[in-house]
Amino acid sequence: MMLSLPKLSAGGVVVLLATLLHTLTVQGASVRHHRLRGGDQGGFLAPSSDMIKALEYIESLKQRADGPESPTGDYDEVDKFRFLVQLASLQDENTPTHEDATRWPDNKVPQWVRSLLRVLDQAGESPESQAAGNERRLHKTRRPVADGESPAGDYAGFVKPHKKYPLMFEDEENGRDNKRATEDLDEQYTPQSLANMRSIFEELGKLSAAQKRDDEEDGEDDDDLYRVRNAAYEDVTGGEEWVPLEEQLETEELVKGSHEEYKRALGDISEQGMENMERRGEEEDENPDDDTKLVDYYLLKVLEMTDQAQKRDLMEGRRRLLSRPSLIDPRAIKQLLSAISMKLQVPPEDLVGMLFMEETRKQQQRLPEPQLARNPSQPRYKSRVIKYYNGRQPEVTVSDIPHDVKTEDILKVLGLGNLANKNAKFSLLKQRPYKTAMTNYFNPNGRRGSLFLSELNKAPSKRKDDYDDDDAVDEDEESTFLAAKLLTEYPDTSSSNRKRAIDSAANGQLPYELYEEAMKDFFDQVDNGKSALAKRDTQGKEEPEGPQKPPAQDPAQETVDQTPPESGTEDGKEYHGKIVAGM
């Protein structure tokens, strides 16, 4: 199979490129590629006769191919050849440019060019016979020629019919088309072309291997030369590395300068350290009190800060109290006061005054009372236990009586308004006798009554102010002792005690006179064998608050009788409690 005209033109282009690159020893596939990689190379070799013949033949083929329509061939093979040439040029970049073609290994490049020319000569023997059949075969990327524009060829002796008329022999037409397609494929890939391609690849491989061997040999030669030089230098210098004299001097000067600078810096640092230490020692010697002054300063600052913090806390507390809203509405308080005043028929002003008085009284009660000198015989704590022997509970206790209640009001309530005078007030306050129970001397139940002994010892000292006669005082003490003893053993639980107390208060009798009357009644009862106490109910007899109790009473209930009177006001209060309790 012979190559067609388009194939011939493509082959000519490839041959031209190959001859320009390899015969002239230009390292690169093209001038532009070579410029990009290394720049222009100067100097060219003289062209050979084979190259001139190839160029002349390519020009003749191009002139033959020029016509009314120059179809473009398939550029696949052209691209392949260009790629191969570029690969060869990349492998041969380091080859010298001014060498002759005869220096190539085994003189293979001219043979490769000759083989390409031989293939082209064989393909160019009958180009005219295949020109008509290959006119319609265009490049695959180009647009096919229209039917109206294409020349009316006979297609191997068969006239192409018109489109309107169908073909009579379709099988023959299809067979002819298939033959043409296979012919094109055979023309593209012939055994001869494949063999040529294989030979080209082999030549390129040999070229690259030879170039590698040359590079390795050159490197080994250089290494051998370097080793020889090193061995000779070591023999002369004794194994030391060879350095130029100027560089050696410069390095020595640099090392010396660095050592000197290092030593100088160390000296400066040591001198500065010594100076600083000496300066600090001098300052410490000159100012030994700086530390104490500093500590005092900080202490003062801390104290000032604490004072300021305390002041700030006080101000914040006051602000908080001032800014706190009232929990009670003043209007609600006003309405409450008006409602209470209307219910009690009391003006609101009086209600407010009463509230203020009650509040002040409570505050006074909360205040601690001044501690008085205590007798060692008195108990530290006392409790009041009120006893009632008539079986009736008190209607009003002492705590229920207001503080400002007067004695005259109580007497009026009890129906004793005729006693509301000064003597009555005095007698009521003094009506309570001295606590002279003789349980200290004689206690049949074994209960302790040491408090009565102290009260008995106190009573004569008080009566000495009223009487100057010592004999009378002794008699009074004896009578008081005997009366208390008798009343303790034989208590009188009759209801006439209250009447006697009131009558004795009206008569102005003092407590010790009552004790004398009790003694007389007892002696009369013993002599006559009769009870004289019932006959003398109207004359009055007040028995002490404590002695009138059965012997079997609970000892915890005697504490109220064992407490001494602290003042006249307290006696008055207890008297009120006693009188009201008997109602």
Curated annotation (Swiss-Prot):
Signal sequence range: 1-28
GO cellular component, one term: secretory granule
Location in the cell: Secreted
KO phenotype (gene knockout): Defective hindbrain central artery development due to impaired migration and proliferation of central artery cells. Activation of the MAPK and PI3K/AKT pathways is inhibited. Hindbrain arterial and venous network identities are not affected and there is no effect on the Notch or VEGF pathways. Decreased courtship behaviors and reduced spawning success. Reduced levels of gnrh3 in the hypothalamus and telencephalon and reduced levels of oxt and avp in the telencephalon. Reduced levels of lhb, cga, fshb and gnrhr2 in the pituitary.
Start and end residues of each stretch annotated as Disordered: 123-159, 526-583
Location, primary (coarse class): secreted
Sorted UniProt keywords: Angiogenesis, Cleavage on pair of basic residues, Secreted, Signal
Coiled coil: none
Recorded superkingdom: Eukaryota
Start-end of Basic and acidic residues biased regions: 534-546
GO biological process: angiogenesis; regulation of sprouting angiogenesis
Role: Neuroendocrine protein of the granin family that regulates the biogenesis of secretory granules. Required for neurovascular modeling of the hindbrain. Acts in a non-cell autonomous manner and is required for migration and proliferation of central artery endothelial cells. Required for normal courting behavior and spawning.
PANTHER family (UniProt xref): SECRETOGRANIN II (PTHR15119), SECRETOGRANIN-2 (PTHR15119:SF0)
Family affiliation: Belongs to the chromogranin/secretogranin protein family.
Name of protein: Secretogranin-2b
Organism of origin: Danio rerio
